Each structure stands twice: as structure tokens, then as C-alpha cells.
Amino acid sequence: MDHERMRRLHGGKSGGLERVGFDVALKSKAPVATDTWEFRFERPAGFVYKAGRHVRMTMLNPAYRDRGGETRFFSFASAPHDEDLVFVMRMRDTAFKRSLMALNTGEVVRIEMLVNAPHGAFALDENAIEPAVFLVGGIGVVPAYSMIRDTLERSTPRKLVLFYASRTPEDAPFLVELQDLAARNANLVFVPTMTGGDLPSWAGESGRSDANLIKRHIGNFMPATYYIAGLPDMVSAMRSVLKAEKVPAANVLAEEFGGFTMAHGHGKKRGSLLTIGIVLAVAAVVVAHLAAGAFVLRLGSFELSNPAMIAVGGVAAVLLLAKLVFFLRSGHRT
């Protein structure tokens, strides 16, 4: 999930798009793939959402804390007709994920959802009739699973095609469930492919999703809405494939997934700290010059024989030289 983009959409306490929040209690948690867990929460009365949408989840009383904060964004793995709210995620060694794992049944988290999806949101148009083609990798299958189940539940004639790349079958959440759905629904074409090399136990497609794989199963790129979800590199590669096949950009929706990283936030913090440091350094220079000036006035006329004046002059020269070096290294251009 692109956490920075989600933060911009949600904004702060008083900014961003309109949203609604609920406190939801944990019902159960269970592993569903390698390093991947399902968290099932009670669905509040009157809670309505669309398949493929996301929520902002906040730990109210986290057992662990770090600089990443107590908030993350997750797509629904459940479909709107399900009794519970379900989220599936890769587990990483972060304070948020450890706090989530530490939750006991009945303990609550807060989830917030945008009231109206922004333009271009990663969600299925329920009124569309053209085919929907999903190109997903890894945990990017989560919103696709929600949207596919919702579409099949509504018994629409819309054709659905899912290309699902995973390293191994053991790493692939919902693999068995999707195989079962495809076996029972003629409108769903499911093409899983494994990228983990030689897998004797796997008899299906292998290798990354690409134009050749797609064409083998659906022929030429059909007029459709294409949904891409996965790691940033995978999303970029699929965009390039669709562009090369002349698929209109307006027919492509994408959502980047990946482990939460504090690098972006840390970069901002480093930038802020650097700015603060520069300001403090300039302030120190100004104060030093003022002090030197006051010292000169107090001593009277400048005399090279005066050791105090030599010291003051030396300090001033060093400060001026430091300012000049900083000026040149900062890349200043007139």
C-alpha cells in the first residue's frame, strides 16, 4: 500500500477528504500463507463499504512503539456481503505489526474510511460491463480477491481475468480459494504463475507476468479495465506492458503494495534537521559577530599588539571562511 499517498488523501485531524471512523474488535487471527496473516474484526452495524477499498487502521493502545507510528493503511480482503471485516497482510518486524499480533480477541483498533472514493481510486465500477483484467503480484492480490468475490456474488455477466504472480504456492494467499472460485464460475479466468524457479510440485505457469503470458490466455489485449496491484517494480513493469500494447491510460488503475518503510519519513526528518542545523549555525555566526563587535568597541581601537584583538580577529576570520565554504558547497548560483 502506498502509505504516503494514502496519508495525503486522508490528511490530518482537520484536513483531507471526508472520512468516517469506527472502533472494531478483533474476532480472530490466523496464518494464510508464509509470513502472511489474516485478521478478522467484528463488523459494526451500518458499516458499508465497496470491494477493493482501503481503511486507515490505528492501534489505540499499542504494545510496541517505534518511529513508524501507530497507523497503517490496508485494503479489505473481505467483500461487502461478508459478515466480518477481514484484512490480510505480510508480517514484518515493525512495532505496528507486533502490536497487531499481540492483540487479544475482543481488543479494538480504530479504522477510518473515506466517505467518497477519490477519482481514479482502486475500486471496481459496479455498473461497468466491459471485462476486468487483474494483474497482481504477492499481497497485491488482496483487493482483487475482494472485488472478484463481490462481482461473483452479485451474479453479473461481467468477465473477470486474474493473473496472479507469486514466488511459491506457499507464499500465495487465497491461491486455493481462487482456484475453487474459477472452477465454479465460468466468468472467472484464473492464471496463477510462480516466479520462484524450479518448483517440482507446481504444474502451472511459471515466471513473471508479461505480455506473452497474458496473450496466451486471453489473446490480444481486449478492451477492458486493467487493475494492477503489487510491488512498485511490478506495477511499473505492468504499466509498461499495457502502454506497449496501446491500452489507454484511462483504462488502467494501479495500486502499489510493499512493506511499510520509514525511509521517506526519515528523509523528511533528516531534511528538517539539516535545515534546523543550518539556521542554528547562521544564528551562531551572527551572535559571534555581534559579540566580537561589542568586544572591539569595549577594547577601543584595533591594535595588533593586543592579544585579545588577535584572538577576536582569528575567530572572525574562521567564521567568515566557514561561511564562504558553506556558500560554495551549497551549490549557490546567481
Feature map (PLM): residue ranges:
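Ferredoxin-reductase
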Residues: 5-109, 166-168, 194-197
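Short, conserved phosphate/pyrophosphate- and ester-handling motifs at nucleotide-, phospho-/glycolipid
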Residues: 52, 140, 231
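Short, surface-exposed secondary-structure boundary micro-motifs
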Residues: 60, 114-118
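Conserved S-adenosyl-L-methionine
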Residues: 129, 153-160
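Conserved beta-strand elements of the Class I
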Residues: 131-135, 227
